[in-house]
Structure formats: C-alpha cells, structure tokens
C-alpha cells in the first residue's frame, strides 16, 4: 500500500545509530543488503541506503544487481571527501577507504570536533585555503628525517614528500605500520591495516621519499644523518599504574599486564580481569580474544555503558 507513495525510499534497519553505523568489529561491508533488497523488490521508486560501504566495487555491485539505486556513504566520505571524483576519474587505487573504527561516531556522541583515523585533515574545513589533499610546496629543497614508521610517521613522510622535501623514513622494526601490526590482529580489526597500506601505496608514488626498515636510530645517528628537519613519531606505551580516563592516584600493580605485554607474548594464566578505563576498543577486543583462547574473562570498566 505504501510502496509508491514516497518519491524516494531511504531504507535503514530500525533502531538507533548502532544499527546503521556498526563498526568493522561487528559487521561486514554492506551488511544491510538483504533488508534493502526486500524494499527495492516492492517499489519502482528510487531506493537509497547505508550499511558500512567502503569499497567502490561493493557499491557498484549493489547498484548493478538492483539492490538499490544509489549509495549513502557518510563515513566513506569522511575518510575520503573525493571518493566520487576518484571513482569517476579511474583513481580507485588512491581512495582512502574507511576502516570502520567509528572514531567519527564516537566524536559525534561526545559532542567534540569530528575526527577520522584515515583522514587527519577532517574538521579543518574552516581554514582559509584549506584542502585535504593539496598542500603548499615547501619553499626550499631540504631534507627531512622521520623516525618511526607507524601511522603518524607514514602520514608525516607522505605529507612532507608531497611538499617536495627529500624524505627518509627510518623504522626500527622489520615492517611498517607500528601499532597497527599488533592491533589489526584483534577480532574484527583486520580492516585497520588500510591505514598503513594506503600510505605505503601513496608514498610509493613519490620518488623523493625513501623507506628504511630495520633501521633503529639514536641521537648520534640522527646527528650524523644531517637532516634539516627531524620528526619523532615513535609512539607510546600503555601505562600499568591504573591511570586512564578517570582521575585516580597511580598505583603499583606488579602482576598487571598491559596490552603491550599481551601483544609481546606474555603468558596469561587463570581467570582474567580486563580493566577498561580507556572506553574505546582495546579492552573489549582483548577480552574477546582472551575468551576465545579459553580464559575465564571478567570485564570491568569505569564507563557508564560498556
């Protein structure tokens, strides 16, 4: 009876944003396809929907198969504002695909400025002359040394390279990616490696950026290198004194393990208490992994909602 009444059907699974904005941990790409296809089969009017789309191939597939007529892609457009243009111009390899981490949704929930793991320029639109991908050339032909090949180091090397500097990126480990090499092994977080993969791909297009894995550097090495600019992107470590979001006095916990310890292969025995005072992904994902390994896990958090 209602099939032909609207001019457009905007289809979504009912319920709060937890349904249409699911993260990569809890849903695959295009997870609402069956629901959308059902509505499309009942009407001749145009149908649009969402469902964590990131890949142009998946978007085109649903349109060609008649699942819907056009795609709603908010998070993919946050990660890459030029997604439609890159598809139109045949530059699919340059698309900065959304990883489904939902840091954008978290920012919206908290009423703070929007941010994006894939797109560090998100929220800078108010700046005069701002552009998320075009950056002014550096006025001099100088050398820059970036120490640390994690997400921040890769982004710094890419940006400096686009500005025209001669860039060397030194990473102490054998591979690039930093924390991603560990975190992407947690349940549902494999897509997070896109942060590394996209930057390595784009750096590969720049002849003025060189990558040096397995290259630890101390102060003497930096001085000997003789760069005009040195950037430290060596990351940080998890605290083991109980301090997180909540204001508490640091305490000693000799038996406590941090995520760094677990990723390094520390032996985990007996019932496990995972204490979460970060309120993001790490504690829940670690608890899920430990439970899958057969441990009895108790999840404790200071957050009002787990």
PLM feature spans:
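N-terminal glycine-rich dinucleotide-binding loop that anchors FAD/FMN and/or NAD(P) in oxidoreductases
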Residues: 182-211, 245-254
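Short acidic, glycine/proline-rich loop/turn micro-motifs
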Residues: 19-24, 179-184, 243-245
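Rossmann-like dinucleotide/flavin-binding elements
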Residues: 138-172, 211-224, 234-249, 253-306
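Flavin-dependent oxidoreductase catalytic cores
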Residues: 1-147, 151, 155-167, 239, ...
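Short connector loops at secondary-structure junctions
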Residues: 12-17, 171-186, 197-198, 301-306
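Redox-cofactor binding/interface segments in oxidoreductases and associated redox assembly factors
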Residues: 11, 73, 230-233, 274
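Active-site charged/polar residues at nucleotide-handling catalytic sites that mediate phosphoryl
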Residues: 66, 225-226
């Amino acid at each position: 009876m209602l099939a032909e009444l609207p001019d457009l059907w905007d289809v979504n699974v009912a319920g709060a944003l937890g349904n249409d904005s699911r993260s990569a941990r809890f849903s695959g790409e295009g997870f609402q396809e069956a629901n959308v296809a059902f509505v499309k089969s009942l009407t001749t009017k145009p149908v649009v929907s969402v469902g964590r789309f990131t890949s142009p191939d998946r978007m085109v597939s649903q349109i060609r198969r008649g699942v819907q007529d056009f795609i709603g892609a908010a998070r993919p457009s946050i990660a890459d504002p030029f997604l439609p243009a890159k598809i139109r111009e045949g530059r699919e390899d340059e698309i900065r695909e959304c990883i489904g981490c939902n840091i954008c949704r978290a920012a919206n929930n908290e009423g703070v400025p929007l941010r994006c793991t894939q797109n560090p320029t998100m929220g800078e639109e108010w700046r005069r002359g701002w552009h998320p991908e075009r950056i002014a050339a550096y006025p001099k032909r100088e050398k820059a040394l970036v120490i640390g090949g994690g997400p921040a180091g890769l982004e710094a090397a890419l940006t400096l390279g686009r500005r025209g500097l001669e860039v060397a990126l030194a990473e102490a480990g054998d591979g690039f990616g930093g924390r991603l090499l560990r975190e992407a092994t947690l349940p549902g977080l494999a897509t997070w490696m896109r942060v590394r993969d996209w930057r390595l791909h784009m750096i590969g297009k720049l002849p003025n950026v060189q990558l040096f894995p397995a290259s630890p550097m101390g102060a003497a090495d930096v001085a000997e290198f003789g760069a005009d600019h040195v950037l430290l992107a060596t990351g940080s470590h998890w605290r083991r004194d109980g301090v997180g979001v909540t204001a508490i006095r640091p305490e000693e916990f000799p038996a406590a393990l941090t995520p760094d310890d677990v990723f390094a292969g520390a032996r985990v025995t007996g019932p496990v208490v995972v204490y979460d005072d970060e309120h993001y992904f790490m504690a829940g994902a670690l608890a899920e992994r430990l439970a899958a390994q057969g441990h009895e896990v108790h999840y404790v958090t200071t957050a009002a909602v787990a």
